[in-house]
UniProtKB/Swiss-Prot annotation:
One of its GO terms (biological process) is translation. One of its GO terms (molecular function) is rRNA binding. Pfam families: Ribosomal_L9_C, Ribosomal_L9_N. Binds to the 23S rRNA. The keyword Ribosomal protein applies. Belongs to the bacterial ribosomal protein bL9 family. Keywords: Ribonucleoprotein, Ribosomal protein, RNA-binding, rRNA-binding. One of its GO terms (cellular component) is ribonucleoprotein complex. PROSITE patterns: RIBOSOMAL_L9. It comes from Psychrobacter sp. (strain PRwf-1). This is Large ribosomal subunit protein bL9. The keyword rRNA-binding applies. InterPro entries: Ribosomal_bL9 (IPR000244), Ribosomal_bL9/RNase_H1_N (IPR009027), Ribosomal_bL9_bac/chp (IPR020594), Ribosomal_bL9_C (IPR020069), Ribosomal_bL9_C_sf (IPR036791), Ribosomal_bL9_N (IPR020070), Ribosomal_bL9_N_sf (IPR036935).
């Protein structure tokens, strides 16, 4: 089945491309989600009429993602968690925890945008975490995990000194 993509889809294609997909994927996912149209001559004409509008929407999303990436530059998130003597956490810090901490600090981040390629964080320490704001735009933040009985103020002062 051939479809016209109405937005960029990872591992499939970009806006406006006509691609071959399995019939079930096209009928049951891409078309109902509004991500593609069947590649009929009538739909090709409709798409060409809307191409500029769709490209403008994509450009706006890209600009918004760039703006959010600038806001996330040099962000240091300090989190506290219970841990044992050796620094191993009781539990773990995951994408939801990091997204919630960023949201509390005034930066709107969805948990699906937080990327932890090595899995959840299970040790006290500093970690660089990527935030994927758009297909091609990533922001890197520093997440510092302290023991719950650790001194948060000292860690904040240390982070400020490192930034200077």
């Amino acid at each position: 089945m051939q479809v016209i993509l109405l937005q960029r889809i990872v591992n499939l294609g970009k806006l406006g491309e006509t691609v071959d997909v399995k019939s079930g994927y096209g009928r049951n996912y891409l078309i109902p989600q509004g991500k593609a149209l069947p590649a009929t001559p009538a739909n090709v004409e409709k798409f060409e009429a809307r191409r500029a509008e769709l490209e403008a929407i994509e450009a706006e999303e890209l600009a918004a993602a760039n703006k959010r990436a600038e806001a996330l530059t040099d962000v240091n998130v300090i989190m506290r968690a219970k841990s044992g003597e050796d620094g191993k956490l009781f539990g773990s810090i995951g994408t939801r925890d990091i997204a919630d901490a960023l949201t509390k600090s005034g930066l709107e981040v969805d948990r699906a945008e937080v990327k932890l390629p090595e899995g959840t964080l299970r040790q006290v320490g500093e970690y660089n975490v990527d935030i994927q704001l758009h297909h091609d735009i990533f922001a890197s933040i520093l997440v510092t995990i302290l023991s719950e009985d650790g001194d948060v103020e000292a860690a904040q002062q240390e982070a400020e000194e490192d930034a200077e």
